[in-house]
């Protein structure tokens, strides 16, 4: 039986055992509704995506089928199917079934399927354990308040993985900006994040759109991130 079928059987058994799941709709406050209507649909959808459910799994066994890799969390029996669309497709073409990976999952689409479908973001587990964080990187946020002035705030961004994907980095940085700097409360215009490495190389995330799918599986060395700069316009 394939891994996917085993996982679905486990999920079905769980539903039969626990019974139906019910949800209760919560009213939206007038102030929240006003905030949501102040931006375009595209910006609203960006905020919804970057504040949506995400899952950070460690040391899961992967099983490859074509350009997809399947993982099942042994505790919750949750099936995760990762679509390879970029450099990870070539990198993992000779992957051996049962290899251990860390997996960062963000559900894609609006399906209510019990399976978590995601794109990219498979990386090697850390080579050793760390008591605290692996690295604290300086995060500088410059926010434009008028045509000739801006506020600047500095803080730290925690790096916990030796090998980290652009998908995870982009998602967690945007979530921090939403929580602490009102990202997507207004239109992001040409706002961007720049991640600079020790050797001068850099990676840019444009905040007026999602990270491109072909970049989601790209991984970089988390130990060599020098600084992160954000421009909010």
Identify the role of each PLM range:
Residues 173-233:
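C-terminal, beta-strand-rich globular interaction domains
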Residues 72-88, 132-198:
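Mature extracytoplasmic domains of secretory-pathway proteins
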Residues 48, 59, 71-73, 83-86, ...:
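Surface-exposed beta-strand edges and flanking loops
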Residues 1-30:
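Sec-dependent N-terminal signal peptides of Gram-positive bacterial secreted proteins and lipoproteins
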Residues 100-147:
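Surface-exposed, polar helix/loop patches in the mature regions of secreted/periplasmic/lumenal proteins
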Residues 6-11, 41, 50, 227:
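N-terminal functional modules and adjacent low-complexity/disordered segments of proteins
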Residues 92, 96-100, 109-112, 197-203, ...:
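Exposed regions on extracellular, virion, or secretory-pathway luminal proteins
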Residues 27-109:
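N-terminal, intrinsically disordered, polar/charged segments of Gram-positive cell-envelope systems
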């Amino acid at each position: 039986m394939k891994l996917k079928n085993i996982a679905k059987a486990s999920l079905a058994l769980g539903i039969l055992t626990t019974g139906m799941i019910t949800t209760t709709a919560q009213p939206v406050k007038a102030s929240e509704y006003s905030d949501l209507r102040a931006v375009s649909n595209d910006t609203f959808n960006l905020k919804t995506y970057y504040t949506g459910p995400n899952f950070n799994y460690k040391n899961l066994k992967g099983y490859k089928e074509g350009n997809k890799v399947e993982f099942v969390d042994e505790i919750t029996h949750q099936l995760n199917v990762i679509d390879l669309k970029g450099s990870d497709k070539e990198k993992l073409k000779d992957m051996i079934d049962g290899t251990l990976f860390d997996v960062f999952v963000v559900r894609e689409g609006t399906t209510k399927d019990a399976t978590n479908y995601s794109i990219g973001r498979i990386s090697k587990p850390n080579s050793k354990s760390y008591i605290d964080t692996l690295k604290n990187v300086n995060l500088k946020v410059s926010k434009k308040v008028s045509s000739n002035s801006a506020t600047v705030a500095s803080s730290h961004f925690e790096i916990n993985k030796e090998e980290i994907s652009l998908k995870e980095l982009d998602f967690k940085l945007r979530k921090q900006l939403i929580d602490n700097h009102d990202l997507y409360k207004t239109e992001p215009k040409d706002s961007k994040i720049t991640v600079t490495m020790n050797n001068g190389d850099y990676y840019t995330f444009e905040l007026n759109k999602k990270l491109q799918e072909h970049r989601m599986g790209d991984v970089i060395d988390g130990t060599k991130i020098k600084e992160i700069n954000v421009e909010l316009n």
